[in-house]
């Protein structure tokens, strides 16, 4: 498996690419350089928000008919909301766990190309 970043806009650009454009550019690049016998590609979130990382992964999987499985290996984009909800307090563990579960579920749906923004709380 490979563990790359997605092709996203640079920090100095004034325009923001759509998730569809990011997906198309990323997949186009990989089709040129990644052998079809590579079993999977797991993406890093690389400076994206939680929602951006999920939406971009979803858009790539919606392209369909790809030779690789596309999934995620997110750190911050999987944990940030849960850590914020927890804030190191025992009394926040339940909400933090639910927050983490939600984010994991959203990313799981994105690996299937079945995530929709309406599913976000």
Model-derived features with residue positions:
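Active-site capping/gating regions of soluble enzymes
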Residues: 1-121
């Amino acid at each position: 498996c490979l563990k790359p970043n997605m092709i996203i806009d640079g920090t100095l650009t004034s325009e923001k690419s759509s998730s569809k454009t990011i997906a198309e550019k990323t997949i186009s690049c990989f089709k040129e350089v990644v052998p079809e016998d590579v079993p999977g590609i797991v993406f890093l979130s690389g400076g994206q928000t939680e929602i951006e990382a999920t939406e971009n992964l979803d858009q790539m999987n919606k392209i369909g008919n790809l030779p690789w499985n596309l999934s995620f290996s997110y750190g911050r984009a999987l944990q940030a909301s849960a850590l914020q909800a927890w804030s190191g307090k025992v009394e926040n563990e339940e909400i933090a766990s639910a927050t983490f579960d939600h984010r994991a579920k959203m990313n799981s749906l994105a690996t299937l190309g079945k995530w929709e923004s309406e599913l976000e709380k």
